[in-house]
Amino acid sequence: MLLLIKYTLLYGIVLMLVALGGMFSEHSGIINIALEGIMVIGGVAGVLTLTMLPADMSPFLVVLISVLVAALAGMVYSLLLAFASINLKADQTIGGTALNLLATAIAVVIAKYFSDSGSAKLNYSNKPFLFSIGGLELSIFVPLGIVLLVISYVVLYKTRFGLRLRACGEHPQAADSVGINGYKMRYAGVLLSGALGAIGGLAYIVPPVQTWNFEVGVAGAGFLALAVMIFGQWKPFNICAAAMFFAVFKSLANIADSTFLAQLHWSSNIYNMMPFIASMIILAFTSKNSMAPKAEGIPYDKGSR
């Protein structure tokens, strides 16, 4: 049971953070398919920072610097999507897909350049990111994720910025008529998405293991986070609940050999498939009732009415 809780929280927080990032982007009117790529960029930036920091540095500073660098890298990378979608009015789905493909290539090149073995694997210490409570080893991203969840809710529903962001995702022309700059708000939404997605990427890669092969990217976690966002109806606390639900399925692959599931003699690949199969089944029944922002995916033209 402790193992199930451990891995559910581990993967649930990752899915929640990335889905929250997608939520901000889509509430501004931009569909961020590039979450998978943003996770990879955030992961490689954070891991590379980890390898360069002094071994005797305070664990708090190690975590802080790594997270900030990852978030900054994600924001910079997300600017590519923002520029293509907002300024060039390019198709957001195609642009996001291209960035997903580019991210893995960039990460592999960077990893091979800095790796001692010349492979795409980077070794690092994950000890600063782990702590124990009552014999349960948890990731530092668990409390950080809870804090970011609350902040996301407050920002989205209790601030003027959040109101303006949501207005731009529902009817940007109406928002413009009352003096809200739709272009700036969409940029802000995508940048927030980049920061949270990149932190989620670092949270996915670092806590479980001490080496990562960037040729595998993040194994579809970004796409699963999109399903979590839709299932959570673009609302922070609903997204958290959906993330934990899908994380239970994801956790089965890690605990199967140490539970009664070992008697089934199933391959771990079957358990790894479960969250994706569950997402397809659930979305097939719930997508008709989804309340997506009305203007998402539609290029904003200030002159159109």
Feature locations, PLM:
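Short, non-helical or kinked segments that cap or interrupt transmembrane helices
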Residues: 24-45, 86-99, 164, 209-223, ...
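Membrane-interfacial amphipathic/re-entrant helices at transmembrane-helix boundaries
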Residues: 1-18, 31, 45, 54-65
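Transmembrane alpha-helical segments in multi-pass inner-membrane proteins
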Residues: 212-276
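Cytosolic-side transmembrane-helix boundaries in multi-pass membrane proteins
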Residues: 152, 170-184, 257-305
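Helix-loop-helix "hairpin" substructures at the membrane interface of multi-pass membrane proteins
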Residues: 137-213, 236, 241
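Alpha-helical transmembrane segments within multi-pass membrane transporters and channels
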Residues: 57-102, 147
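Hydrophobic core segments of alpha-helical transmembrane domains in multi-pass membrane transport
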Residues: 18-19, 43-47, 104-108, 142-154, ...
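Transmembrane helix-bundle core of multi-pass membrane transporters
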Residues: 92, 103-158, 259-270, 297-305
